[in-house]
């Protein structure tokens, strides 16, 4: 993998674009493990976001029935089309945050770090069986954090409300070219059964975690505008907010179920839709 990536960089005089988060994975064993964790069948369709120079794409193409690879950089697309002769790979040019994803079973990607958050929230709106994704380590740690942890955040809540998530491998920065400033990690996500998924009001979760170390009721009072309340509304509803369930807990201690309790209370009191 190392020699393949560097031969292509040399051949095409390619300068990785830091604005697009181009840090190419160059360690074959890491790529092999990422593909193995996806447990790909030849009948399945795989989505890859940011194929880079195609080394992961090539391994996916050997196993899957179909691979959709979304790439924003026209230079990279030209290289992929010249260097590979895939019959089951469709390269889609565009911004992964803006285009509608095709139907897919699984998603396997070394994600551009600067779109980690929005692309994760977008993926959670799609039906898939498994996701094997490489993230910046700190972001991955937030995804798996539990109530009370220092990394527990809005991201932790919104992800774990929908999927089972595991951090399965830490990757040193030397596994990439150019070498990033931070380590990375492999995350595996599998959606929970529909009856176990919890739908949460995103504005409420944002309002709470805007002040993650404050008591739940105080956090909501300080972020009332994020709930769509005017100052006059807030004066009217302040006594109700003070009575929210779990008001004696700090936000970073709230479980997903606790947050759902707060949401249902506020909805019953007509504070949120």
Swiss-Prot record:
EC top class, as a word: transferase
Keyword terms, alphabetized: Cytoplasm, Methyltransferase, RNA-binding, rRNA processing, S-adenosyl-L-methionine, Transferase
GO cellular component: cytoplasm
Domain of life: Archaea
Entry keyword Transmembrane: no
UniProt xrefs under InterPro entries: KsgA/Erm, rRNA_Ade_diMease-like_C, rRNA_Ade_Mease_Trfase_CS, rRNA_Ade_methylase_Trfase_N, rRNA_adenine_dimethylase, SAM-dependent_MTases_sf
EC annotation from Swiss-Prot or TrEMBL: 2.1.1.-
Annotated CDD domains: AdoMet_MTases
Predominant location: cytoplasm
Residues annotated to bind S-adenosyl-L-methionine: 23, 25, 50, 71, 95, 110
Subcellular location: Cytoplasm
KW Disulfide bond (keyword) present: no
GO molecular function: RNA binding; rRNA (adenine-N6,N6-)-dimethyltransferase activity
SUPFAM superfamilies per record: S-adenosyl-L-methionine-dependent methyltransferases (SSF53335)
Family: Belongs to the class I-like SAM-binding methyltransferase superfamily. rRNA adenine N(6)-methyltransferase family. RsmA subfamily.
Function in brief: Specifically dimethylates two adjacent adenosines in the loop of a conserved hairpin near the 3'-end of 16S rRNA in the 30S particle. May play a critical role in biogenesis of 30S subunits.
Name of the featured protein: Probable ribosomal RNA small subunit methyltransferase A
């Amino acid at each position: 993998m190392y020699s393949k990536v560097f031969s292509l960089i040399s051949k095409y005089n390619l300068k990785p674009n830091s604005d697009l988060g181009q840090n190419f994975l160059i360690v074959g064993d890491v790529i092999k493990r990422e593909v193995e964790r996806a447990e790909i069948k030849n009948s399945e369709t795989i989505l890859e976001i940011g194929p880079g120079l195609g080394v992961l794409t090539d391994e996916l193409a050997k196993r899957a029935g179909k691979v959709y690879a979304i790439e924003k950089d026209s230079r990279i697309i030209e290289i992929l089309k010249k260097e590979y002769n895939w019959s089951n790979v469709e390269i889609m040019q565009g911004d992964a945050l803006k285009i509608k994803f095709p139907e897919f079973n699984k998603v396997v990607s070394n994600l551009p770090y600067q779109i980690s958050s929005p692309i994760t929230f977008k993926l959670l709106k799609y039906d898939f069986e498994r996701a094997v994704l490489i993230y910046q380590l700190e972001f991955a740690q937030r995804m798996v954090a539990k109530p009370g942890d220092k990394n527990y955040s809005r991201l932790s809540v919104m992800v774990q409300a929908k999927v089972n998530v595991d951090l399965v491998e830490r990757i040193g920065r030397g596994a990439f070219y150019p070498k990033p400033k931070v380590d990375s990690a492999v995350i595996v996500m599998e959606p929970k059964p529909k009856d176990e998924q919890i739908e949460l009001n995103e504005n409420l979760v944002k309002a709470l975690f805007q002040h993650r170390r404050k008591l739940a009721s105080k956090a909501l009072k300080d972020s009332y505008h994020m709930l769509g309340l005017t100052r006059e509304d807030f004066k009217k509803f302040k006594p109700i907010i003070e009575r929210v369930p779990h008001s004696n807990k700090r936000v970073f201690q709230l479980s997903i179920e606790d947050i759902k309790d707060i949401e249902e209370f506020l909805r019953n009191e007509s504070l949120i839709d």
